């Protein structure tokens, strides 16, 4: 696996080494020693998957508040997604920055997202499957989010939004809950 920093954050793009032959292909997606050697202190505690049947589906923006901020590894195992992260850590030099990356089943590229980031994605094709390894267990009382179209964080979604849950549509704005956001660096993209 090859690890690349995402712009100026401690998030990482992870490019598995893919072995191909007449049967198809094989790639290792997790090995504790490899992650540790790359400086990624991550131990999976939970695995999740989501299947979105419609192109243009948005899921997000989600995060889990301290003390159980959840690092995660995201992989698109079928289809393509526009994956978005926002650094919400108040002391981070990249707080408030938006980063986006296309993840596809064909490339196998994964995204490591440290705790303290919000995460969301939009499907770019029908029948898209996304899998996550989570560094924390889900804690319902600490689960939080903000709207995908929050005016304080101008996230660009490449497709018209065709499907979104009532919960994701109903999240409150982020700015009243993060007073430091107004002083943050301008939004950036990968």
Feature annotation, model-predicted:
Residues 1-107, 127, 134-190:
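Non-catalytic, conserved peripheral segments adjacent to functional cores
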Residues 103-126:
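Conserved metal-binding segment of the jelly-roll/cupin
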